[in-house]
Regions:
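Short amphipathic alpha-helical segments
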Residues: 7, 66, 173-177
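Short hydrophobic/aromatic beta-strand or adjacent loop that forms the aromatic wall/cage
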Residues: 51, 99, 187-189
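Residue-level detector of anion-binding/catalytic polar loops
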Residues: 77, 129, 179
Length: 189
């Protein structure tokens, strides 16, 4: 597991996004990682020193103040702090010219390999089987809603199929007749 692009993902965690639904999902997963560690015994590498959001321009300040209002609506902790507190939290940053500083105490990052393996441990604890190095050639939904997953190693009958194909997720979804609007892109970080 995690031999594709997962192992080097930035894995930043924060609760706010321009979309309300994605904000709720991100906020939920920030809590989930700690629960997942406790439940499975597998470390997710959760590190939450907090995140600072800085505004140098009027437009960015306006955007951060909108984010703070959304955070309040969603019940998230995202608030303005003064320069003194920001310097205490991050003494290496030069805050000259900064108009507004917001702080998200729960912001941080996780270990993407640890998270993946914690999900795998949790799934196995609940009876899931993970078939690595087993290409799927077809999926056939049965009348009762279960699935036959066809592979070169034989067919697998299962009540659920989880598409964890990452970069190849769109192609795997097509095997089930699903058009997944997923487009892999190359990026630098």
């Amino acid at each position: 597991l995690t031999s594709g692009s997962t192992w080097h993902a930035a894995a930043n965690i924060h609760g706010l996004h321009d979309s309300a639904n994605i904000s709720r999902l991100q906020h939920y997963t920030m809590k989930l990682y700690n629960e997942l560690e406790a439940e499975t015994g597998q470390s997710c590498g959760v590190f939450q020193p907090g995140s600072l959001y800085l505004a140098q321009t009027e437009n960015r300040e306006h955007q951060l103040r909108l984010q703070a209002a959304k955070a309040k609506l969603y019940g998230m902790n995202f608030h303005e702090i003064g320069r003194d507190e920001a310097e205490r939290l991050h003494p290496l940053v030069n805050f000259d010219g900064i108009r507004c500083i917001m702080y998200e105490p729960d912001g941080g990052n996780v270990d993407p390999s640890g998270v993946t393996n914690a999900y795998a441990v949790g799934a196995r604890q609940r009876g899931a089987e993970i078939h690595r190095f087993t290409p799927v050639t077809a999926t056939v939904q049965q009348p009762d809603g279960s699935w036959i997953v066809e592979t070169p190693k034989g067919n697998i009958h299962t009540p659920w199929v989880i598409n964890a194909a990452g970069l190849w997720g769109r192609e795997v979804a097509k095997l089930a007749g699903i058009e997944l609007p997923l487009q892999p892109t190359e990026h630098q970080y």
